[in-house]
Amino acid sequence: MARCTTCWRRMMRSTGWATSLSTPQTHPGELLTEEDASSAGTEDSHDEVQEATPQSSINPLEVFRSKLYNLDDSVSVWSDFLRIHLHPNTVSILSEYAHDPEQDMFDVFGYGQQLLGTQRVSADLEDRMHFFVEDCDSLQGFQVLVDPYNGFGGLAAEVLEQMSEDYDNKGILTFGCYPSMYVRRSPIVDYHRLICTALSVTKLSASSSLYTPLSVATGLGREPGPMASFPYLTYNPSLHYHTGGILATALDTCTLPYRTRSDGVLMTELTNTLNYSGRKMAALSARLPFPITLDGALAASLSQFVAAPDLVSLCPGVKEPGRSFMQSVVLRGVPPNRICIPDPAAHADSIFRDCRSANDCLKRYLQYVYPGTLNAGTVVHEPLTVTTPFPHLFNPEITHDGLVGFKPRSAVQGVEKVPGMTSLSSQSGLQGSLAALHGEVEKVDIRRFHRFLDAGLEEDDFKEAVESLRQLARAYQTSDNEMAEDSDDDSD
């Protein structure tokens, strides 16, 4: 029986890149996605090929490889580059609000809750959900992407609460996607986002099997904070087209364990492992591309990671990886001829000297670097496909097949595929993120924000949400960050 997941999403997602709602048919060993999330796009008249270098400097083989194109000025929303055809039941339009309006903004948590209370929206979403659920041979659960900083957080909270009751034995893996930068900024708008974020974190984590905030920004409160830095990527944080592409690669990779047929796991097995002891939030970190040099091997790259694990956090507020309680690590796209150390005799002291496969290398790495962590490692041979319309983010030293080269690639040549690595973890670093969010929101006098009160939020309910946020932060507290917190209190 084919296993499938259903991804709940909304129209006009500015961050864009997401798994489509589908029940794909695959052969054993293939991924259970209709197309790789990072290659879901369209080639159209918007494509612009950059000026070519002189003919004498171009390798004839590069003519047949991926060319550069420029969509930075023409892509606005995810539907601008959607390649696959959506089923008519996929999209539900909320006619009560417009996308990015100047007035009547959908920026209050309760507005979304009120929408689901209407017969039209409730019946429409329920009918569409049942259509796809009934089309699944064996439903694993639901993979949910949501904007948690506005009214869609309230809508999602109501939908997930109903889903958790109707499908209590299925997994609900929710990703809250935050922009790296906000176009509209003012004190009142920033506080609205802060309140929506706090309410979403408590409500969505309660109704989900696992909830993961996502952003290339490092802050979860009113200020987005600095942007995440990747060693081999150059991106524009003001373009959702760029930041959405980065998040898509991480999402597509970290969800592979329950989307592969061979040696895969169920979504519930993954979420139940990570949400142990009531820790229903997880942090996602990634390395794109995973660095393997032209003359190097996986074992050599992991040896560098042993000295200093170098995954980049995509969880706002988690600046540095903390102690991991449990984690699911996925390594993908390592070429078969780039696994073992070329000369084992010259590396007799390496912990990878007797490893003969990518699985062996990853297992040894996790045992050595995270000895006190419950680790689950997954190796997938398929690399990330980053051809059109994926944005050109890769630095010139990355070759067309994703390796770290010794000279810049041709100016007319793009990158076609890359290896990648992600870690989805329950870790102590979340305590600092949640504590910082709690510290901001507990100072809010909700009585000053009448639109939230008019939308049905009670003062006692808000205080309860703030307390739930504090309790959630305490669930990730360890002796180390508890001592750091006490030290900060003493200095104050």
Question: What do these predicted ranges mean?
Answer:
Residues 1-492:
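Terminal, contiguous helix-loop blocks that mediate binding/assembly
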